[in-house]
């Protein structure tokens, strides 16, 4: 898991979990050190353009990527988008996506809830997902569950619609 540095020097640690294979298969990139370097570069991407470049390099060097490599790229795009929103985790499984908000007592959580990030996210979710989501509070963390997603593509589309290119993350000054 990589942290993504925002212009205000706050770090959002975001992880993405998917229930489909999301990796560079050994038969596709045979050299283990090369696979490691490719994983590292992808985890350090901070823009969609960097992910696009990584994906193009993969195709140029190793040929058409298998579905597992495509899934890895989709997960990286989801991570980038979720980090900009201020989410700590995104889980996609069984045609559903769970968006995990930060813990209320954490530095990130205090800013997220007190400065309007949560309210922005909630209103964007209502517009993007309609009645197909529910809010679950678990301990000091809030989760949004979105149902009716057919693929990682549809999960990413929902996440991008919620993000709408505008960050709901409220940076923490250090």
Predicted regions and their residues:
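Accessory helical-bundle/CTD segments and flexible terminal tails appended to RecA-like ATPase motors
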Residues: 1-174
